[in-house]
Amino acid sequence: MNETPTLPTAPQSTVLVATDADNVHDEVAAALSGDHQVVRVHTGAEVLTAVTTHQPVLVVLDLQIGNMGGMATCLDLRLEQRAERIPAQRIVMLLDRDADAFLAHRAEADAWLVKPVDALVLRRTTREALTA
């Protein structure tokens, strides 16, 4: 029997996406799922628990998410990190318009981009955020 040996594959790193918009999730998953396992939560209130459970290498926050917006969620993650209750996270925010960059900066996001999500820009932004 002439079987080709299979090489072991490295486990994929996890990216957490927080959005209540299906189209935003689909765009992010399509752009990143080749290199990462994409896990979704629908509200900002779910992010902290998901970070603890899934230990993502990157968190992608939609500025406009459910009960706790992306800015508040980003600030909450930064406070938890400073209190050493969670490991440091790289955070990319998805904004609605260029003017929202001020909010992303104030929320201490590592990077941001304006929706609609361009797959190439998101992959580049993700790579840069992870290597910073």
Predicted regions and their residues:
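Conserved acidic segment of CheY-like receiver
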Residues: 11-23, 27-29, 59
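Alpha4 helix (beta4-alpha4-beta5 surface) of REC/receiver domains from two-component response regulators
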Residues: 72, 93-111
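The C-terminal output helix
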Residues: 127-132
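Two-component signal transduction core modules
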Residues: 59, 112-113
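Conserved phosphotransfer microenvironments
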Residues: 61-79
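His-Asp phosphorelay/catalytic-motif detector in bacterial-type signaling
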Residues: 57, 82-90
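Acidic, metal-coordinating helix/loop segments flanking the phosphotransfer/catalytic sites
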Residues: 42-58
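C-terminal output helix
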Residues: 117-126
